[in-house]
Amino acid sequence: MILQVQPAKLIKRYKRFLADIELNCGEETTIHCANTGAMKGCAEPDDTVWYTTSTNTKRKYPFSWEITQSQDDHFICVNTLRANQLVEEALHLDLIKELSGFNELKREVKYGNENSRVDFLATYNNAPDTYIEVKSVTLLESGHGYFPDAVTTRGQKHLRELMDMVAQGHKAVLLFAVLHSGINDISAASHVDPIYAKLLKEARLAGVEIIAYKAGFSLQLGELDVKLVEKIPFIER
């Protein structure tokens, strides 16, 4: 995925979906932030914000916060909408070997008993249907990656739905899209959401497959190339 981006300096994030930035010209403006999480370590004052500009002239906030370049020089994709796009791109490029060979890939398919939509449903000729839930990972603490960065009842529901798919004879995958250049392994954040961590352990024992792929970032002349490039370990802590 290639994004046309421009840099700015972060002043502060607030109201979840908004942040104030200082443009290179010195002007201050408000930017849209497509992230409802805590964004711990991803939104410190004076971090560099890389943003895209919408062509929709009716948008109140034409700039979208895509990437944080932290003061210790990590790249972090904070636009959570990009996770599914990156996974879809990687699946079609056959970069996620555990899920290769599908005939069809469908998005946002209704499933389960709790009125959910799975991120992707992959169908195969000689293998079970595969239900894939994608989660974006940006929380780095003490050299390790964690999910979630805030309590997520929605994420808890998705784990129950995935376990139900396994019980019905399907394949179920929880795919962590690791969008922080400093993360090299990932674990459940039991210190953030102990219920989620407990359900994740139950899901793994029930047969839900857990996969984590890390994004690579390349920035040249205002073009930012982001793609999932490396499998990293999921570690139970």
UniProtKB/Swiss-Prot annotation:
User: In this entry, which stretches build a coiled coil?
Assistant: none
State the organism named in the record. Answer: Colwellia psychrerythraea (strain 34H / ATCC BAA-681) (Vibrio psychroerythus)
Record protein name field: Sugar fermentation stimulation protein homolog
InterPro entries in the record, alphabetically? SfsA (IPR005224), SfsA_C (IPR040452), SfsA_N (IPR041465)
Give the protein family.
Belongs to the SfsA family.
* Molecular function terms from GO: DNA binding
Lineage, top-rank taxon, reads: Bacteria
Known Gene3D superfamilies for this protein?
Answer: 2.40.50.580, 3.40.1350.60
